[in-house]
C-alpha cells in the first residue's frame, strides 16, 4: 500500500486526476491524504468533493480554512465572494450530504507507524502531541453537534484568539485551535499568531515575525509534519521532516503529491483553459 499526500487542491480537479494517473493510484490498495482546502477558487470544487466522498476509507483529509468557509456559506452565515467560486457546489443537490461529510473530518490526522502528523496550516510550537490531540478533538466534537452553526461556525471568525492560553474555555479555546491549525503562517516572537503576512520568509520585513516551523518544538523533533495553506513557500522549507505541499495550483502554479514510502514529490502544472 502507498500513502499519497496532496497539497491544497482548491477545486483543481483535473490536475488532481492527472497526478493520480501518474502514480497509478488505486483506492483498493492505496490511500490519498489531503492537507485540506479541497474547495474554493479553482474551477471544480464540486467534482473534487464528490471524488473524495466516493473514495470512502481510502481518502483521508483534514479541514482547511476554505472548507470551514464553505460551511459558513451553506449556513447563510457569510456572503460568498466571486473569488470563492463556490456557486456550483452551494447549489448542488447533494450539498447537505457534502457538508455533513466535511463535518466528520478532523483538523489533524496521524500516521503513528511513520511518526507523521498532518494538519492544514501546521502545529503551534507550544503544543505537545497530547495537547494537539485534545484541542483538535474539541473542535471535531463541536462540529458534530446539531447546533454547530450557531455554537461554532458563526463565532469562529475572530483574530482575538491569537495566543495559546491553556486556561481558556468555550469558544475562545476553539477559536485558537481553528486559527492555529487552519490559518497559521507566522508567529510573533512571544508566540502570538500573526494573521496578515503571507510572504515567504525571505520577503518578510517584520523582524518580530518568524515562521511557525522555525520555533523550537517537541513535535518538530519527533515527527514529520505535513501541511499546506502557505502557497508562497512553494514547498521550500529546508527541512526533510517538514512537508509543505501547497504549491499554488489555483494561482497558476502546480499541484504537488508526495509519495510517503518513496519520499518522492510528483507535480502537475496548472492546466490551461481549453
UniProtKB/Swiss-Prot annotation:
MF GO annotations: bis(5'-nucleosyl)-tetraphosphatase (symmetrical) activity; phosphatase activity
One term under GO cellular component: cytoplasm
InterPro entries found in the cross-reference section: Ap4A_hydrolase, ApaH, Calcineurin-like_PHP_ApaH, Metallo-depent_PP-like
Keywords, comma-separated and alphabetical: Hydrolase
Annotated SUPFAM superfamilies: Metallo-dependent phosphatases
Gene3D superfamilies associated with the record: 3.60.21.10
Biological processes per GO annotation: RNA decapping
Catalytic reactions of this protein: P(1),P(4)-bis(5'-adenosyl) tetraphosphate + H2O = 2 ADP + 2 H(+)
EC numbers on record: 3.6.1.41
Task of the protein: Hydrolyzes diadenosine 5',5'''-P1,P4-tetraphosphate to yield ADP.
Family classification: Belongs to the Ap4A hydrolase family.
HAMAP family, alphabetized: ApaH
Protein name per the record: Bis(5'-nucleosyl)-tetraphosphatase, symmetrical
Organism: Shewanella baltica (strain OS185)
Gene behind this protein: apaH
Amino acid at each position: 500500500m502507498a500513502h499519497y499526500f496532496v497539497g491544497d487542491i482548491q477545486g483543481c480537479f483535473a490536475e488532481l486526476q492527472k497526478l493520480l494517473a501518474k502514480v497509478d493510484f488505486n483506492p483498493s490498495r492505496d490511500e490519498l491524504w489531503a492537507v485540506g482546502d479541497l474547495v474554493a477558487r479553482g474551477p471544480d470544487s464540486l467534482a473534487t468533493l464528490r471524488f473524495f466522498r466516493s473514495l470512502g476509507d481510502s481518502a483521508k483529509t483534514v479541514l482547511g480554512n476554505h472548507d470551514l468557509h464553505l460551511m459558513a456559506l451553506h449556513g447563510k452565515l457569510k456572503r460568498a465572494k466571486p473569488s470563492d467560486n463556490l456557486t456550483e457546489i452551494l447549489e448542488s443537490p447533494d450539498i447537505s450530504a457534502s457538508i455533513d461529510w466535511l463535518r466528520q473530518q478532523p483538523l489533524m490526522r496521524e500516521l503513528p507507524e511513520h511518526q507523521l502528523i498532518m494538519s492544514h496550516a501546521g502545529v503551534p510550537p507550544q503544543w505537545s502531541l497530547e495537547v494537539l490531540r485534545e484541542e483538535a478533538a474539541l473542535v471535531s466534537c463541536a462540529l458534530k453537534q446539531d447546533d454547530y452553526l450557531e455554537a461554532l461556525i458563526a463565532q469562529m471568525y475572530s483574530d482575538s484568539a491569537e495566543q495559546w492560553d491553556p486556561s481558556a474555555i468555550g469558544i475562545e479555546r476553539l477559536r485558537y485551535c481553528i486559527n492555529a491549525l487552519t490559518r497559521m503562517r507566522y508567529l510573533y516572537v512571544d508566540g502570538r499568531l500573526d494573521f496578515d503576512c503571507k510572504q515567504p520568509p525571505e520577503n518578510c520585513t517584520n523582524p518580530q515575525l518568524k515562521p511557525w516551523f522555525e520555533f523550537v518544538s517537541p513535535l518538530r523533533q519527533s515527527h514529520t509534519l505535513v501541511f499546506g495553506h502557505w502557497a508562497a513557500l512553494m514547498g521550500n522549507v529546508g527541512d526533510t521532516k517538514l512537508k509543505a505541499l501547497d504549491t499554488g495550483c489555483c494561482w497558476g502554479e502546480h499541484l504537488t503529491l508526495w509519495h510517503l514510502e518513496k519520499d518522492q514529490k510528483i507535480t502537475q502544472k496548472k492546466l490551461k483553459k481549453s
